[in-house]
Amino acid sequence: MPSTRDIRRRIKSVKNTAQITKAMQMVASAKMRKAQQAALAGRPYATLMNEVMAAATAGAGEFQHPLAEKREVKKRALIIISTDKGLCGALNTNLLREAAKVPPATTVYVVAGRKAAQWVARTKRELVAEFSFKDSPQFAEARAISKFAQELFLSGQVDAVDVVFTNYINTLTQKAEVRPLLPMGRIKKLEANLSGPGTSEDLQPGSASEFSFEPAAGQLLGNLLPHYLNFQVYQVLLEAKASEHSARMVAMKSATDNAKQLIKDLTLEYNKLRQANITKELLEITSAAMAMGN
């Protein structure tokens, strides 16, 4: 049985841990709000961009573009968007479990985030590029990833490019998913609003009558495709950061709550042990007094 000194030492240790997790919770909460606002603010633009792309595709007729060329998939590139740090619950575990479903023998890996890089190295998979991005992702960072993916596809090194990331749904819910990027015909249409994640469905040619294109839709589409891909990657980075900070805030709150409960339990155990020691001492004193009286 532990002594009162051991319990006091453990209570002090847990209190110190609770202070750390509480501070991390507050930092994550501040970052979470900013990241969530950025992710949600980008969704209306992403939705409108899809509508424009669908309308331009309808107006372009038989449109041909190197980024839309469909080939037999012999080699695939998988872009993994992970976190740099841990302490965010099962977020990275779920993400990498989804990435592991892609057959590694026919896949090369592009990573953004240290956790993904460590996983690729640990599992001895083929890494072709590693990127990093800030807590507030910049469009230039997304463009660098997108440009590299386009170069892989256009050079014929890969026949398809997918991205696996954690999609932000709400503060308590984040979902790891694989989204196709190239060829462009495999892009998903995202219908989203500011209050929810939206739904994904295949991008289909829309009604060109809603838009008037100058110059011709085909010419515009050729210039629009690279920007469209850049923004898709940028939105993925925003969703990943919103998911990371939300998961970390929830994890740190849970850790703080658990620490507080543990402190209560230890304090109760300490008081019981202290009371037992006092009772034992009183009994010894009483027994000694009675023995001396006799």
Predicted features, each with a name:
Residues 1-294:
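C-terminal beta-strand-loop-alpha-helix "lid" module of Rossmann-like NAD(P)-dependent dehydrogenases
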